[in-house]
C-alpha cells in the first residue's frame, strides 16, 4: 500500500510542466536571472529549455505539433551562436511544446519601437493566440517597458504616484515645467530604460533645457519625462506572482547618488510590508496584467495609513538581488521560512505555477 507521502509526491509530479525561458543575453548586460531560474526549475524536476531570442524560431509539423528551434548551449549555459570565427549554424534538438503542459517565460523583449527585436514579441504573440501561458504577455511587457504608459495606468487606476509630465519636443522644457508645477530638484527619465539607466537629476531650468535639446539631437523620437522628486532614504521592490506577494526588499539610496537600483550599487535589505503597501502592490501588478512582476514604490511618511508612491512595474524582474537578500535574512520570518524549508523565492515562483488554475486559457486548467 502506498504511503500518504507517496500519493502526495505523485500528485505534485502529475502537475509538473515544461518551462521555456526565452531571453536575450546581451554580452554588455549579462543575464544571470535566466540561469538561476533554469537551475531552480531543474532541481524541481521540470524539463527546461533555455533559448536565446536571437536565432530562435517556432513552427508546426504537418501533424500539428509545435516545436521551438534554438541554438545550443555550452557547459556554462552560454548560447553558442554563429560568429565570424564559427560560421556553422548549429541548432539544438527541437523542443516540443503544448499549451496544456508548457509555460513560457519571455524576458528581455524590450519595446517594439526602441529595443529588442519586434519579431521576438511577434513570436510570443503566436504563443498567446494558441492559448499558451506566457510570463508575461506582450501587452504587459509593452506597458512595463514604457515609463509613460506605466504612469498613465497608475493615474487611471487611482494609484499614488509622483507628478509626471512628458516633454513633447526639443523646446518643450519650459511648458513641461509649468504643467508639472513642482520645485527643483526634479527627476528626468527616458521612457525606455532599466537598471537606473536613463534617469537623471535636474537642478535648474537651464540644465533641463540643455539636456532635453541634447537628448532630442541624439534621438528625434525619444520620449522624455520629468517627475517630481520624492525625498526618501530608500525605495521598495516587491515580487508579486499571480496575485501573491513572495518577497520584498528595500533598496537604500546609493551614497553620492539619488538612485537605488541594485545594479547601481545599492545593498538591499529585507522589507516588511504594511497592509496598505501589500494590497496596493498586488493591485499594481494586476493593473498591468502581470503574472510575475517587480513592483517599485517609495514609502509614504505614514506607512500604516497612507498609500506609497508607485514608480513603475517591471515585467522581467531580476531575482539575483532578492534571492541573496532573503537567503541572508534567516532571522526574519520569510527568510527563516525559506531556509527551514530549503527553498528559495525563485523555487516558490516555479512551484506556484504547478497550480494549473493560474494558467491562461482552458487548456491550462
Identify the role of each PLM range.
Residues 18, 102-103, 309:
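Structural motif
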Residues 19-24, 34, 124, 129-130, ...:
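Active-site nucleotide/adenylate-binding loops and adjacent lid/helix of ATP-dependent enzymes
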